[in-house]
Amino acid sequence: TANIARLLAKQGNKVFIIDADINTPSMNTEFEGDHPHEMIWVHSSGNMFSKFIYLEKSMVRQYLELAKKKIHSINPDYVLIDTPPSVTNVHIELLSRVKVSYVLFVTQPTKLSNQDVLRTMDFFHERCGKVNCGIVENMCYGTEHNEYPIRLVAQIPMQDNMNTENLLTNAYNEFQKIVDEIVQSDIVVLEEYSTENGYDENFDVTDIHITGSRKHYFTHELKY
């Protein structure tokens, strides 16, 4: 996520990063402060709750709501959401507030990692519908060939001694493939559902059945 943001910023785009790995944030170590670069803004729990080792649900909601306010204020060209490897309640909270236009699944070319990605894919398809998505293989040796149900966008090579300091330079072409994919997918990477400009009927219960003197509410579908 950090290197994609750096490359987008280098090409003149305003980038806002939401660190959705609440318990073990990393964007606060990748970047210094909330506005580390002229074109990059970082929203990380590592900056906001640096003295906490556990965040209550209300704090997570506060964190996500503040992210939405920052989007209004910054008006970025791209919003990148860095998520933990496994699905958490934060994913569910986040997807109840936002609509994503592209999901990038990062995996390693191993059987176990591939299985995890396939399970995560099912979750996002259920929550996001038919959204554009792709796979990035990380820590590759260039000899493996894996089949995926969606497009393989890029393969990031294994670095000597696991040193990722110059990763963007060493794998520039692969990161450019990712950026090209994101740029072509949609003009807006993330948009929020809002009632700010009036009542939003997307949140309506689509069917209510009333029987006799008692009211029974059957929710057939909730549009998020």
Where are the language model's segments positioned?
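A short helix-to-beta-strand connector/capping loop
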Residues: 35-44, 131, 151
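C-terminal lobe/tail of nucleotide-utilizing enzymes
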Residues: 125-224
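Walker A/P-loop NTP-binding active-site region of P-loop NTPases
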Residues: 1-38, 78
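Cytosolic-facing regulatory segments adjacent to core modules
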Residues: 44, 48-88
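Amphipathic alpha-helical transducer elements in NTP-driven molecular machines
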Residues: 57, 61-65, 111-118, 168, ...
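Conserved catalytic-core segment of NTP-binding enzymes
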Residues: 70-74, 78, 84-161
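Glycine-rich, phosphate-binding/catalytic loops in enzymes
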Residues: 33, 59-61, 96-99
